[in-house]
């Protein structure tokens, strides 16, 4: 039997989780590790922001980086994080809750795009 408000057997809310890819980087393994890597070879890297949502709440996890940082760091910006979020129906101007996992440039670079968010 499920809880009538949550739909889950445990009574906990159910959320959808989306990974939104906004940038990429072509690189070698040695570019990712201090001191290099003796097994050097291609090791591309993708960059994501995340959305965790249900009918009552939307949380954005990390805010990514923008065009200026992408150019300075040699990353390929596929779309801004805000554009990626808009593609799944999330308006950054309306997001109230943002979770920052840590303070690296690729996790917190466009925080100003979330004017009413609580971090």
State the predicted function of each range:
Residues 2-11:
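C-terminal regulatory/interaction regions
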Residues 22-87:
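Conserved beta-strand hairpin/beta-sheet module of binuclear metal-dependent hydrolase folds
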Residues 13-16:
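Extreme N-terminal starter segment of soluble prokaryotic enzymes
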